[in-house]
């Protein structure tokens, strides 16, 4: 295998290695895929404003998330069905996250169980939760996560319906026999209807409670003592409401473009959300992060940390646990270099003054 020098190269390699149906499931987004492109392009409109002649002989990227110390502000977002990428699936991902001393978020659409991932080894892990019609199932999942030592619930709020991912329809996406949705283990997966071209999506969507609303977050807090991070927010209004309903944190996300197309890039909405949160809760962010420079820009605009998704899946597909370790290492190295060249020796030293946004440039021009 050729030397991989950045995480984007893993995606290109995975495109040639994975079955088309699997690659498209991971890579292709909703409808016109405008948001997918914008998630990446928005970073190119944010420029650096470095500070020079600073002693950067020692760079400290460590930080604390909900009281847990991690080595860097880069964490693993919840993504589905890792065994489609590699036989060890989420177990390999969990080991790589632990080796990097960072947080892994296990998807409730995982191909390994909550307990199996816990047994993969030590590490700080969060559990992503969708709200299903069967509240007993939801409560059981939470109890299992608590018993297994997961440290927080990541509640997905932007997917009451699944986005229309046309590639899955064309490919008639279904699960191979050796991969299953572990949260549905014991249920009749023969119920998955293959006739509509996207059997998995149709079956899982049918289990999601489309009536779920803000008041149900209060119910969730009655069945768990774990902090609840609300994932899928991109506006100040929803940030305010989430905090009012007791969210322990916000994870800004547009689902990587997989849900509603023509959403703005999360990085473009970050300052609005951070201003509304006003330090009351941490604001994390995902969607489109592919470089350490992207991470730096988010931190400069007020994010408390960044979650990555697809780079994990594609690096896992190419080289298993070692691939995910390498992807995390490359992002860490890129962030370290960016911090040093910007004059920052710790995450806390990264400030708004280190970047210039498109809005900044417009304001400057208007004063001329």
Swiss-Prot record:
Its EC number is 1.1.3.15. It is found in: Peroxisome. It is an enzyme of class 1 (oxidoreductase). FMN binds at residues 78-80, 107, 128-130, 156, 231, 253, 286-290, 309-310. Binds 1 FMN per subunit. It catalyses: glycolate + O2 = glyoxylate + H2O2. Residues 1-360 form the FMN hydroxy acid dehydrogenase domain. This is Glycolate oxidase 2. It comes from Oryza sativa subsp. indica (Rice). The lineage of its organism: Eukaryota, Viridiplantae, Streptophyta, Embryophyta, Tracheophyta.
